[in-house]
Curated annotation (Swiss-Prot):
This is tRNA uridine 5-carboxymethylaminomethyl modification enzyme MnmG. NAD(+) binds at residues 273-287. Belongs to the MnmG family. PANTHER family: GLUCOSE INHIBITED DIVISION PROTEIN A, PROTEIN MTO1 HOMOLOG, MITOCHONDRIAL. Homodimer. Heterotetramer of two MnmE and two MnmG subunits. Gene3D superfamilies: FAD/NAD(P)-binding domain, GidA associated domain, C-terminal subdomain, tRNA uridine 5-carboxymethylaminomethyl modification enzyme MnmG/GidA. FAD binds at G13, G14, G15, H16, A17, G18. Keywords: Cytoplasm, FAD, Flavoprotein, NAD, tRNA processing. Its main location: cytoplasm. Pfam families: GIDA, GIDA_C_1st, SAM_GIDA_C. The keyword tRNA-binding does not apply.
Length: 629
């Protein structure tokens, strides 16, 4: 039967990509359906109970800047907050939060249920409705037809999912959930390039069976950072400690002895696993010279005894899992609540996508999350928001939008996937961004919120808060510029101990802040005519802008040079096979990938600077030929 209502956007899957996609589309004002096989698992943290980290928190902040849900849900559920790389420069600082699974899921569910224009429905999607080659809805397992203008697939690890524990395996999307077999088969019949990837999770431990006195405590920051620009510390639940233990030679011997029953090392699993989150088996093989590995013992929440031992993801047989867990200090009597496992699943080559995340082979169909070969909640959420936004724009017959590499880590993520593809689960790092001094986690709102408002993503409440913050930054910068310190005054005497040489002439507070030994707090109250303290988000922006002005200016110049090249479009009808001077390999890649711009072509693996120059020459000749025709 046909469902009585017709939708503009249907989102399939209720994980981190799906929830952000559905919320984004609904915020755009279009009628949106979120379809999940089980609405009790919406927003579930399937693996580690944490949000953020190096590179990842930048994505979370960008989601937040565009009014997404992840950052605020983290503030409402975070039970430990830390700033990573706090002693390094602002470009690579990152916020990481340990989250209470139950509180996080509840925060996401609350957001979904109270979002205008969004409907929820519990059913598995088994097929697509296709009209004239375009996606026009989905058919569920019970035969209900949901019609729509666009479809966003965020299937996670569910497409053809197979769970492995030792040499035993069974079909599953994750532990306790069925896989999506019918939809996987339907998608495989379409002209998409499909392959298999693998990820894994560690066994979960009962905290009552662990001796924490034998471990190193790892508390959060004394002043816990806030994840959302709209969040505050008062939102945070009770804060608790994590702990650290280590593997040892005995642990490694146990693992080596079990390798003959490892699905990874006996060829049972063919999918490639994540390079930067390897299983404990992988660590022992790849880092054979190391006799110990650090393991982080992370509580799963405030109302559960369950622990997540971060660092021992494994698909070894359960008897080996028991032995290896109990070989570690403090875990000698550990009781495993859930076994660790690996899961193998289908993913689709992201080079078959447009930059909007719409598929090239089927108009109206968008992919987001692990289906595109990424790993991580943050990467999934960011893609979901972009796919939901662009599905809504397409439903409204408006042009798509994707941030550039110099505008957002989301732009880096999408460009990497589409220009280079991936053969292993893709994880975001700050090192992937050329312009990371501009793409900091602290300024994501300054980069994206205005654009989000223009697109229709950003609420009145967030927009008002953003405008207030932006104005405060301008006012405080102006105050520092116009406030002067002269020698032999109480103000000068208070700041001189911080300087290498005392003040000998008049300085503005802005110039003083440029000094390497001076931080904002040193000058905040000098010549301060303000009624109340400056908000820490405001003072942070002021300080970074002053301290790094020269570097930021140089990056802006680099970006402008690249942008001139970025805007050089490569027409769809270019016949690369007839271009003289290009190697056959480059011709093949350009024909297959059809990059939209010269800059996009330059980022394709194997496309040399010389080849880019040849393309530019060809475009100029083509333009001259057309003018004279």
């Amino acid at each position: 039967m046909d469902f009585p209502s017709r939708f503009d956007v249907i989102v399939v899957g209720g994980g981190h990509a799906g929830t952000e996609a559905a919320l984004a589309a609904a915020r755009m004002g279009v009628k949106t359906l979120l379809l999940s096989h089980n609405i009790e698992t919406l927003g579930q943290m399937s693996c580690n109970p944490a949000i953020g980290g190096i590179g990842k928190s930048h994505l979370v902040k960008e989601i937040d800047a565009l009014d997404g849900a992840m950052a605020l849900a983290t503030d409402q559920a975070g039970i430990q907050f830390r700033t990573l790389n706090s002693r390094k420069g602002p470009a690579v600082r990152a916020t990481r939060a340990q989250a209470d699974r139950i509180l996080y899921k509840a925060a996401i569910r609350h957001k979904l249920e109270n979002q205008e224009n969004l409907w929820l429905f519990q059913q598995s999607a088994e097929d697509l409705i296709v009209e004239n080659g375009a996606a026009r809805g989905v058919i569920t397992q019970t035969g209900i037809r949901f019609n729509s203008k666009t479809v966003v697939l965020t299937a996670g690890t569910f497409l053809g999912g197979v769970i492995h524990i030792g040499l035993e395996n069974h079909s599953g999307g994750r532990a306790g959930d069925p896989p999506s077999i019918g939809l996987a088969q339907k998608l495989r019949a379409l002209p998409f390039r499909v392959d298999r990837l693998k990820t894994g999770t560690p066994p979960r431990i009962d905290a009552r069976s662990v001796d924490f006195s034998q471990m190193q405590a790892q508390p959060g920051d004394d002043i816990d950072p806030v994840m959302s620009y709209m969040g505050n510390r008062a939102m945070h639940p009770r804060q608790i400690e994590c702990f650290i233990t280590h593997t040892n030679e005995r642990t490694h011997d146990i693992i080596r002895a079990g390798m003959d029953r490892s699905p990874m090392y006996t060829g049972v699993i063919e999918g490639v696993g994540p390079r930067y989150c390897p299983s404990i088996e992988d660590k022992i093989v790849r880092f054979a010279d190391k006799n110990s590995h650090q393991i982080f013992i992370e509580p799963e929440g405030l109302t559960t005894h369950e622990l997540y031992p971060n660092g021992i993801s494994t698909s070894l047989p359960f008897d080996v899992q028991i032995e290896l867990v109990r070989s570690m200090k403090g875990m000698e009597n550990a009781h495993i609540i859930r076994p660790g496992y690996a899961i193998e699943y289908d993913y689709f080559n992201p080079q078959d996508l447009k930059y909007s995340l719409e598929t090239k082979h089927m108009p109206g169909l968008f992919f987001a999350g692990q289906i595109n070969g990424t790993t991580g909640y943050e990467e999934a959420g960011a893609q979901g928001l972009l796919a939901g936004l662009n599905a809504a724009l397409l439903a409204q017959e408006k042009d798509a939008w994707t941030p550039r590499r110099d505008e957002a880590y989301l732009g880096v993520l999408v460009d990497d996937l589409i220009s280079m593809g991936t053969k292993e689960p893709y994880r975001m790092f700050t090192s992937r961004a050329e312009y990371r001094l501009i793409l900091r986690e602290d300024n994501a709102d300054m980069r994206l919120t205005e654009k989000g408002r223009e697109l229709g993503l950003v609420s009145d409440e967030r927009w008002a808060a953003f405008c207030k913050k932006r104005e405060a930054i301008e006012l405080e910068t102006q105050r520092l510029r116009s406030s002067w310190i002269v020698p032999n005054t109480p103000e000068a005497d208070s700041i001189n101990p911080k300087l290498e040489t005392p003040i000998t002439h008049e300085y503005s507070l802005l110039d003083l802040l440029k000094r390497p030994n001076i931080v904002y707090s040193d000058i905040a109250n000098l010549k301060n005519g303000l009624d109340e303290p400056v908000d820490e988000q405001v003072s942070e922006q002021v300080q970074i802008a002053v301290k790094y002005a020269g570097y930021i200016s140089r990056q802006a110049e680099d970006i402008e040079r690249l942008r001139r090249q970025e805007n050089t479009e490569l027409p769809d009808d270019l016949d690369y096979s007839k271009m003289e001077g290009l190697s056959n390999e480059i011709k093949q890649k350009l024909t297959q990938l059809r990059p939209a711009t010269l800059a996009a072509a330059s980022r394709i693996q194997g496309v040399t600077p010389a080849a880019v120059s040849l393309l530019l020459i060809h475009l100029k000749k083509r333009a001259i030929a057309r003018k004279s025709a």
